[in-house]
Amino acid sequence: MATIKHLSSKNSNYAAAESYLTFQHNEYTGLPILDEKGRPKLRDSYLLDTLECSESSFAMACLIANRKYGKNGGREDVKTHHYIISFDPKDAVENGLTMERAQALGLQFCKDNFPGHPAIVCTHPDGHNSAGNIHVHIVIGSLRVRTVERQPFMDKPCDWEAGKKHRCTSAMLRHLRVAVMEMCEQADLNQINLLEAQGDHVSEREYWAQRHGQRRLDHANAKLAAEGQ
């Protein structure tokens, strides 16, 4: 079953998004893992592409857009939106899902649902706690850099006009869940009804708080297991 989760970030360091996706980080603290010389270690495997960035990096494309439209100058402004599509671990064995295929699906999903936004699309081969599920990260700059053709899921001019910001509303999340289900159906991948799913819209701070809480629970369970309880 594929799922989609959303995180928003107010971090003005746009380069941090690509750094997180390409370098190894502690899955609980979010801190980079360093080698013996104190340098960040690259991830063992990933695929990464950018969209709507021209010849610039993702970070530079976002900064240029902010300057052009006079947006995202405040500390409380949402700078990026991060969507994570996680596929069923069984898809790799049962349905031939590869990183390359997942990356292609993620790129098309981004083009279809976040047109006009600078974006990073990055596929990783494994999830938290070695879950074995291929997953795709889609990080978009919150500001749209060009006017796009209106799509059925866009209900206000700010959803397609240049210089406007992405809105992750309940209606948008519902649309994205349906889009994920349709994507998996067309690709012959395992899927469940995501319209019954809950809890897929959290802030970056809430996300890491949940991860830290899970770590404490894992330690407690390990201690009980060691004591034979």
Regions found by a protein language model. Give the residues of each.
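N-terminal nicking endonuclease/strand-transfer module with a His-rich metal-binding environment
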Residues: M1-Q229
